[in-house]
């Protein structure tokens, strides 16, 4: 049976894509046919092959199954803003059924999937629709990426509470050091380990000079249910 996980973050720009790539590398290293899925992406570069979003390209390059770009990222919008604003600017709508249809395609080709969301847990996709509504519909186990900075404890606890209020399982969290580590960072990490009722499955250091291809060592999939 295919293992499926949804990646959310305490905020935008906390390293969800980096964490998703690390998870894919770790899964591949222990024999899985692993794929990344970015159903909705905003902001792209127009190439000879069409619109391409950098986050989706990263997931595609870190998967070890053969997928087309449109399978990894079926919905891409020009404006680099919240999905509900970006799609409205193009006169389009996001249907949750489209996200589910894309997920089924990925499931047919892989046995381990990481689905990367957009922004945080309550990111809107349209009028009265949140990204988390779709996660709830699919009953996806959730992995929380925490950008290690001042305020992250509050953001993490609020997000964890919101996930559980949906009746969903927070199966693990990843600490991503989005700035050079300080003494305070270690205090934040210790407090999060004490307060979050989920295992720490990854601790990714400040990676200013470390190749992105070498991320698997920062992930412990043994802790992931």
Curated annotation (Swiss-Prot):
Subcellular localization, as worded in the UniProt entry: Cytoplasm
BP GO annotations: biotin biosynthetic process
Co-factor requirement: Mg(2+)
Family named by the database record: Belongs to the dethiobiotin synthetase family.
EC number: 6.3.3.3
Main localization of the protein described in the UniProt heading: cytoplasm
Annotated source species: Baumannia cicadellinicola subsp. Homalodisca coagulata
Subunit and interaction comment: Homodimer.
Signal peptide: none
PANTHER family noted in UniProt: DETHIOBIOTIN SYNTHETASE (PTHR43210:SF5)
Binding site for substrate: 42
Residues that bind Mg(2+): 17, 55, 116
Name of this chain's protein: ATP-dependent dethiobiotin synthetase BioD
Role of this protein: Catalyzes a mechanistically unusual reaction, the ATP-dependent insertion of CO2 between the N7 and N8 nitrogen atoms of 7,8-diaminopelargonic acid (DAPA, also called 7,8-diammoniononanoate) to form a ureido ring.
Domain of life assignment: Bacteria
Active site (catalytic residues): 38
Reactions that this protein is recorded to catalyse: (7R,8S)-7,8-diammoniononanoate + CO2 + ATP = (4R,5S)-dethiobiotin + ADP + phosphate + 3 H(+)
Pfam families: AAA_26
Alphabetical UniProt keywords: ATP-binding, Biotin biosynthesis, Cytoplasm, Ligase, Magnesium, Metal-binding, Nucleotide-binding
Main EC class the enzyme belongs to: ligase
